[in-house]
Amino acid sequence: LFGETSEKIDFGTRSKTLITSFKIAEAKAIYLDSSPVRSRIEAKKYTTPIRHGSVTYYGPFIFADDHVGGKGHREKLGALCGFLQSGPYGQAKDYYNRAVEEEIGIPPRDPKRRSGTSSVRPW
């Protein structure tokens, strides 16, 4: 339903070259007929800075909230499988959520007040 997403991370090498590139697996379909939905979802690009580089997400994203179990946090539906295959899920999810919040204009929150994100250090 959501297509394939790639993440590219530049860790700030002296040559400014991309040293890590990996793909997030295609999400499992959660809709009986995904083709009409997929054709209507416009691909978007979100970039967020991290220490010594940035994380960029690109693809046709759909966001969810309480009505699909997001519990108030914007989630990328169907991407859980891919994040789990791509390394530390919590850190990747936090980077992604921060990028989305910046894109839609939500100011950053105080990292000390955030709950459930103790694995991420403030930058």
Swiss-Prot record:
Record has DNA-binding as a keyword: no
Main location: virion
Entry annotated with the keyword Phosphoprotein: no
Protein name listed in UniProt: Matrix protein
Entry's Gene Ontology molecular function annotations: structural constituent of virion
First and last residue of the signal peptide: none
Family: Belongs to the novirhabdovirus matrix protein family.
One protein family per Pfam: Rhabdo_matrix
Recorded superkingdom: Viruses
Compartments where found: Virion
Residue numbers spanned by region Disordered: 104-123
InterPro entries, A to Z: Rhabdo_matrix
GO cellular component: virion component
Keywords, ordered alphabetically: Viral matrix protein, Virion
